[in-house]
């Protein structure tokens, strides 16, 4: 799936049965939660000028069941699907990671 901006992608996530979408990290991870972090930017350079065209986000999904429907739903809006990272003994959750590239929105910021 292609999205025009972070807000477009975020609004799509809000249609899914997630408990929360968090930009950043928390001390504890929770079931059916997506954690986002900015990982890189796509920059175009010409002469002495450069333009940020978009951003890459690292996405982490935490779920109780390995076959939770969210694994497929959120995986469909990522660049290359999921990698199963680990099973957390502390939280008893499966953690999946993936990446999504989103072009800059109208304002040009990573969260627009």
Curated annotation (Swiss-Prot):
This is Probable head completion protein 2. Coiled coil: none annotated. Belongs to the skunalikevirus head completion protein 2 family. The keyword Hydrolase does not apply. It is found in: Virion. Keywords: Viral capsid assembly, Viral genome ejection through host cell envelope, Viral long flexible tail ejection system, Viral penetration into host cytoplasm, Viral release from host cell, Virion, Virus entry into host cell. One of its GO terms (biological process) is symbiont genome ejection through host cell envelope, long flexible tail mechanism. Probably functions as a stopper that is part of the head-tail connector and that locks the viral DNA in the capsid. During assembly, functions as a docking platform which the preassembled tail can bind to. Plays a role in morphogenesis of the virion capsid after genome packaging. One of its GO terms (cellular component) is virion component.
């Amino acid at each position: 799936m292609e999205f025009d901006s972070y807000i477009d992608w975020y609004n799509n996530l809000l249609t899914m049965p997630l408990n929360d979408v968090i930009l950043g990290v928390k001390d504890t991870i929770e079931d059916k939660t997506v954690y986002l972090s900015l990982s890189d930017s796509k920059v175009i350079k010409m002469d002495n000028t450069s333009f940020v065209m978009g951003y890459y986000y690292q996405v982490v999904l935490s779920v109780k069941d390995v076959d939770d429907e969210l694994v497929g739903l959120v995986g469909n809006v990522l660049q290359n699907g999921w990698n199963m990272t680990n099973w957390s003994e502390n939280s008893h959750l499966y953690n999946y990671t993936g990446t999504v590239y989103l072009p800059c929105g109208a304002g040009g910021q990573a969260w627009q």
